[in-house]
Each structure stands twice: as structure tokens, then as C-alpha cells.
Regions:
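Surface-exposed, interaction-prone regions used to assemble/regulate multi-protein complexes
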Residues: 1-146
């Protein structure tokens, strides 16, 4: 039996862990998605926050989804019952500015043509849990200010 090892990528320079996304912009013509943060994101090598925005290119809108979970009788993020909704990423982006206040990133995952964010979504005074699953075939660009 042949054994193949899948190595973990070692070239991650930035992390969105603890980033607060306050706006999401998109360009359907160019299939680009832009995450704008309140305080930036982590520069892993320097272990500090840097200001900027994140751009995903080659987004497939019909293959990208957002899962929103509203917990019942338990604090958001804990084990327990919830009700939820799965929606197209495009519908979520259209509603983000008017319906949601921000998205606090807890973790991110980048794999072959799939980029996922999980965290907590603000809706008024409510905290919801959300997973954003983006199918893409382009680059991830970190525009760093300063």
C-alpha cells in the first residue's frame, strides 16, 4: 500500500482570528469579495494586528453559503439546541450591512478552493453563530495599510 502525506501549508503570513468584519463588499462582475475589518487582522510573524482588508478572487456565488445558528435555551457557541438557516453567500452579503452589525472571526480554514470562516454574528443585541463557506478559484489578497 502506498502512503501519501498531506503536508500542512507553512506560508500563512496573516490570520483573521479575532478580526471583526464590519463590512463586506463584492464585485459580481469580477467575482471578488472584500472583507473590511474594524481593527485589522493578525500578522503572524510579528504577532500583532495590522490594518487592512482581505480580498478573495474567483468567488463562485452559486457554490458559496452561509450557515446561521440561533441557539435556544443555551448561550451562543455552547453545546445545545439551535435553529438555523442556510443561505447563499450573495444573499448574506446583500443583507449584511442592514441586518447584521459585525462578524467576529473565531477561526478560518483555507483548503483547495474552499475558504471557511466561523465565528459570531451580531444581529441587534443578539449573538448568533455563523459559518461562511466560500468556494473560489483565485487568490486571497491581504491589503495591508501603512
Amino acid at each position: 500500500m502506498a502512503k501519501f502525506l498531506r503536508e500542512k501549508p507553512s506560508n500563512f503570513k496573516f490570520s483573521l482570528h479575532d478580526a471583526k468584519i464590519i463590512d463586506i463588499d463584492y464585485d459580481y462582475g469580477e467575482n471578488r469579495l472584500i472583507f473590511k475589518t474594524q481593527s485589522g487582522f493578525i500578522d503572524i510573524e510579528r504577532n500583532e494586528m495590522v490594518d487592512g482588508e482581505i480580498i478573495l478572487e474567483g468567488v463562485s456565488w452559486e457554490d458559496s453559503y452561509v450557515y446561521i445558528m440561533e441557539y435556544k435555551n443555551v448561550l451562543t457557541g455552547n453545546v445545545g439546541s439551535f435553529i438555523g438557516e442556510k443561505m447563499y453567500l450573495s444573499n448574506f452579503v446583500d443583507a449584511f450591512y442592514s441586518k447584521f452589525g459585525s462578524f467576529d472571526v473565531m477561526s478560518e480554514y483555507d483548503s483547495y478552493m474552499t475558504y471557511m470562516l466561523s465565528g459570531f454574528l451580531k444581529r441587534g443585541s443578539e449573538e448568533l453563530e455563523a459559518n461562511i463557506e466560500i468556494f473560489y478559484n483565485g487568490d486571497i489578497i491581504y491589503n495591508v495599510r501603512g
